[in-house]
Amino acid sequence: MSDEKIINQPQDVVSEMLDGLTYAYGDLIEKVPDFEIIQRKSPKSGKVALVSGGGSGHKPAHAGFVGEGMLSAAVCGAIFTSPTPDQIYEAIKSADEGAGVLLIIKNYLGDVMNFEMAREMAEMEEIKVEQIIVDDDIAVENSLYTQGRRGVAGTVLVHKILGAAAHQEASLDEIKDLADKVVKNIKTIGLALSAATVPEVGKPGFVLDDNEIEYGVGIHSEPGYRREKMKTSYELATELVGKLKEEFKFEAGQKYGILVNGMGATPLMEQFIFMNDVAKLLTEENIEILFKKVGNYMTSIDMAGLSLTMIKLEDDQWLKNLNEDVKTISWG
């Protein structure tokens, strides 16, 4: 895969990307002056605010999910680099509508540390803040930037379910309680055919041999759990569904939602073929799939690959929240 990119200067990638995003979708979002923060343009409504974010390079996450029914604001760090506590604190202040703020944090050491520092800063200003840490990646227990499991594409489903609850005027305590329950029921596993290339580095994060894949690669090119020769889509789906089955311990009649997420360079054609194979495998398990989504929701710049997320729908309201209409750029 070519390392050439349509950019100007590598150090300007994030700021210019956000400027382009707000120019294109200025009816929905705006940039907080002097900060790499995207927030809703709609008037404040007095509801609980949801703030998420992290290093850039995962678009449309998280800025693409800012809007009515999802996030109030997204904090955008440098490529694959956690935003600073000051950035996050600014996002909390800007998003707060008086009912409190819930932080949705992917489980990476830098993100957790900086979001928690920002939370302390906000609480000193008497802003009510709660947080939830998303750790849906079942591939590995510890990684380069993580203690415990990583937070990956399942985070987007957390945005959606909690965003609907906030829109329905749930309290901060109610949304925090919901978050704790939802996160325990979301699990993700992925694979890569090629690594991401960070613009300022100029070379892939890892190298695979021709016709080789790696299972369990992280969204920052962290190592997975096995490499092997390329397989058919059905064989790849068998591997990922099998791992999720071990985690969830499928039982007939259980209700689930699924998300097939592209990592940045895998065409939708291939994602839909993979989804078809996942559907065949899950049909054999006699479980009900009540929510399905395919597309690029949390990418890794130009990585070729995909991930499969499943959410066990333990409450019918979760499904209703997933299906609620939103006004965002990228939920679709």
Curated annotation (Swiss-Prot):
Active site: 58 (proton acceptor), 220 (tele-hemiaminal-histidine intermediate)
EC numbers: 2.7.1.121
GO molecular function, one term: phosphoenolpyruvate-glycerone phosphotransferase activity
SUPFAM superfamilies for this protein: DAK1/DegV-like
GO BP terms in the entry: glycerol catabolic process
Coiled-coil regions, chain positions: none
Keywords per UniProt: Glycerol metabolism, Kinase, Transferase
Pathway membership, UniProt: Polyol metabolism; glycerol degradation
A single Gene Ontology CC term: cytosol
Disulfide bond sites: none
Reactions listed under catalytic activity: dihydroxyacetone + phosphoenolpyruvate = dihydroxyacetone phosphate + pyruvate
Domain DhaK: 9-331
Residue sites binding dihydroxyacetone per the record: 55-58, 106, 111
Record carries keyword Chaperone: no
Domain of life: Bacteria
Stimuli inducing this protein: Induced by dihydroxyacetone via the DhaQ-DhaS complex.
Xref: PANTHER family: TRIOKINASE/FMN CYCLASE, TRIOKINASE_FMN CYCLASE
Subunit structure, as described in the record: Homodimer. The dihydroxyacetone kinase complex is composed of a homodimer of DhaM, a homodimer of DhaK and the subunit DhaL.
Function text: Dihydroxyacetone binding subunit of the dihydroxyacetone kinase, which is responsible the phosphoenolpyruvate (PEP)-dependent phosphorylation of dihydroxyacetone via a phosphoryl group transfer from DhaL-ATP.
Protein name: PTS-dependent dihydroxyacetone kinase, dihydroxyacetone-binding subunit DhaK
Protein source organism: Lactococcus lactis subsp. lactis (strain IL1403) (Streptococcus lactis)
Organism classification: Bacteria, Bacillati, Bacillota, Bacilli, Lactobacillales
Chain's gene name: dhaK
